[in-house]
């Protein structure tokens, strides 16, 4: 991080076009000449290893099996933990995507197969927030049975077509069978299951959503005590994320996380870096991160911010302002009051004339690619309540239904607050595991609210396997029909939940397959029962994403005919010891 003195002049900031950015150094009308160099550069690729046909597929399968075996251990309420040897103390986790991301295999070709399963887990985690282990196990099973068929002479392209068509039909069936979430009981059940049957976490997530709604729950924080608590703080969430992923400060979660950040709010478009150089200098001298909320940040300004962020000169992020037109200005006023109630936001004020005293302050800022959460200082509570009262008065007086709805949205964002889940534990290892479980529970709950719920415990996938024969009848090509059979075999791999609980998986699958939709096996209590009534439920979105992503990656593997990887470099021999020195 640059020191305050290092940014005393604008010329220190690196421009995306020049070595130095000099504020106002280029005279108006002055032309910058560029001279093409005559040098020619040749790039030499590393030596490669190439494998074809069965050899390539066997290497992929070996890597896929190793990673899927490790991830599959965690499946179900009685799944096992996995110890990850990382920097510092080992981490004990039960989270599929965390395990997948930590595994790198020594064999380059096998690692290529493992990377495909990592992609399944990561993509499912990004889209649904949970179900990564299920997606990994499904992908492995589809690939395993698919490669056997390819080796036996089946057309891989036709197999892929059959898999894709079958999965699409199953998703349509899933949408018909899912039901919406009904109150806090369902929310608690979903959160409890996703947290590894931890009822305390389930109750906490349900309590947080009950207090502020699903939009008000913020990312998880570490607590200074041993207890895990939910605290509702003044704040709001806006439906705009960072303009560029280069601003990310937490690469693992793809988030920007700031504390005690200064906030520049404007309804103008920022294109020239010289307009904000004074603000950048001041915030850097204060060692405070800067959040810029503007109509847009483009061109030279964006490029220069990104370059200096990557070089560690600036701690900054840019976000587009929410809304459009007059509504955008009103929402920016709301944000201004939340972050700095003592300073009125002057929309006519030019960005270059903004002083450090006119910037807002946010105690905590969390920004994803889709949303921004601001937690305000407690001192803004009185002004915030006054703003809410004003908006309620405007809503009461307006005759427009549209305006009334938009005012209601703004009131909800300002009054709902932000529920901060502060996680406590006795050790760092337990803290990390607990935070991962709460993150899964929170994401699964949002997914359930979005697309509804289905029976859990793997029962939904087993029940879906029974409709595949009817789907297969609509296919004419033999290899396309074989693709449907592959999906059917993969769906019953959820028997792994029973196996992890010490029960014969095939027997469990056989019983579930010929029972009603709601009935399934509860591995926690070792009983067959109505899973919806017992609270063993999964979000339909998680099941859908796991199935789609597994089929997508499996299709790519089945149509792969060769692998090209870097050839390992031979290890240099150890230097000989000097004469007379014993090693």
UniProtKB/Swiss-Prot annotation:
One of its GO terms (molecular function) is ATP-dependent protein folding chaperone. Keywords: ATP-binding, Chaperone, Chloroplast, Nucleotide-binding, Phosphoprotein, Plastid, Transit peptide. Residues 1-35 are annotated as: Disordered. Coiled coil: none annotated. This protein binds RuBisCO small and large subunits and is implicated in the assembly of the enzyme oligomer. PANTHER family: 60 KDA HEAT SHOCK PROTEIN, MITOCHONDRIAL. This protein shows ATPase activity. This is RuBisCO large subunit-binding protein subunit alpha, chloroplastic. Residues 1-45 form a transit peptide. Pfam families: Cpn60_TCP1. Belongs to the chaperonin (HSP60) family. It comes from the Eukaryota. Gene3D superfamilies: GroEL (3.50.7.10), GroEL-like equatorial domain (1.10.560.10), TCP-1-like chaperonin intermediate domain (3.30.260.10). The modification Phosphoserine is found at residue 89. GO terms for biological process: protein refolding. It is found in: Plastid, Chloroplast. Residues 15-31 have a biased composition (Low complexity). It comes from Brassica napus (Rape). One of its GO terms (cellular component) is chloroplast. Oligomer of probably six alpha and six beta subunits. Residues 1-14 have a biased composition (Polar residues).
């Amino acid at each position: 991080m640059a020191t305050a003195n290092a940014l005393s002049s604008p010329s220190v900031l690196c421009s995306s076009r020049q070595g130095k950015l000099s504020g106002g150094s280029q005279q108006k009308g002055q032309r910058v000449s560029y001279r093409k160099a005559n040098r020619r550069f040749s790039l030499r690729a590393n030596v490669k290893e190439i494998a074809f046909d069965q050899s390539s597929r066997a290497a992929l399968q070996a890597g896929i099996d190793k990673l899927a075996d490790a991830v599959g251990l965690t499946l179900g309420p009685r799944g096992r933990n996995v110890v990850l040897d990382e920097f510092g103390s080992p981490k004990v986790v039960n989270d599929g995507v965390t395990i997948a991301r930590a595994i790198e295999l020594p064999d380059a070709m096998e690692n290529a197969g493992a990377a495909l399963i990592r992609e399944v887990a990561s993509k499912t985690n990004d889209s649904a927030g949970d179900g990564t282990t299920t997606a990994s196990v499904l992908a492995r099973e589809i690939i395993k049975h698919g490669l056997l068929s390819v080796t036996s002479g089946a057309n891989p392209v036709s197999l892929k077509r059959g898999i894709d068509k079958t999965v699409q039909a199953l998703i349509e069936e899933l949408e018909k069978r899912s039901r919406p979430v009904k109150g806090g009981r369902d929310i608690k059940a979903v959160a409890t299951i996703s947290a590894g049957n931890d009822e305390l976490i389930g109750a906490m997530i349900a309590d947080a959503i009950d207090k502020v709604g699903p939009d008000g729950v913020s990312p998880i924080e570490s607590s200074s005590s041993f207890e895990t608590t939910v605290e509702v703080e003044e704040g709001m969430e806006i439906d705009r994320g960072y303009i560029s992923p280069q601003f990310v400060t937490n690469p693992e979660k793809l988030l920007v996380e700031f504390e005690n950040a200064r906030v520049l709010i404007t309804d103008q478009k920022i294109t020239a870096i010289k307009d904000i150089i004074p603000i950048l200098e001041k915030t850097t001298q204060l060692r405070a991160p800067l959040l810029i909320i503007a109509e847009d940040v483009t061109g030279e300004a964006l490029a220069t911010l990104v370059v200096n962020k990557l070089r560690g000169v600036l701690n900054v992020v840019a976000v587009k302002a929410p809304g459009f037109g007059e509504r955008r200005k009103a929402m920016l006023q709301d944000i201004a009051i939340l972050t700095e109630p003592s300073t009125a936001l002057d929309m006519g004020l030019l960005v270059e004339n903004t002083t450090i005293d006119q910037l807002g302050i946010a105690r905590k800022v969390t920004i994803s690619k889709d949303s921004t959460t601001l937690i305000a200082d407690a001192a803004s509570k009185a002004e915030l309540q006054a703003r809410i009262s004003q908006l309620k008065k405007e809503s009461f007086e307006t005759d427009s239904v549209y305006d009334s709805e938009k005012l209601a949205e703004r009131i909800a964002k300002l009054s709902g607050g932000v529920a901060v889940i502060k996680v406590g534990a006795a050790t760092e290892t337990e803290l990390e595991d607990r935070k991962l479980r709460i993150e899964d529970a929170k994401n699964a709950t949002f997914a359930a609210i979005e697309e509804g719920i289905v029976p859990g415990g793997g029962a939904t996938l087993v029940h879906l396997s029974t409709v595949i024969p009817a789907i297969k009848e609509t296919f004419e090509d033999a290899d396309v029909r074989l693709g449907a059979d592959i999906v059917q075999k993969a769906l019953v791999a959820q028997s792994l939940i029973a196996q992890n609980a010490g029960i014969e998986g095939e027997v469990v699958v056989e019983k579930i397959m010929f029972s009603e939709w709601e009935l399934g096996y509860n591995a926690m209590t070792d009983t067959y029962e109505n899973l919806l009534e017992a609270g063993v439920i999964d979000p339909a979105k998680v099941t859908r994403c796991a199935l789609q992503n597994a089929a997508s990656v499996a299709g790519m593997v089945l149509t792969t005919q060769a692998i090209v990887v870097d050839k390992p470099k031979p290890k240099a021999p150890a230097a000989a010891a000097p004469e007379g020195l014993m090693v």
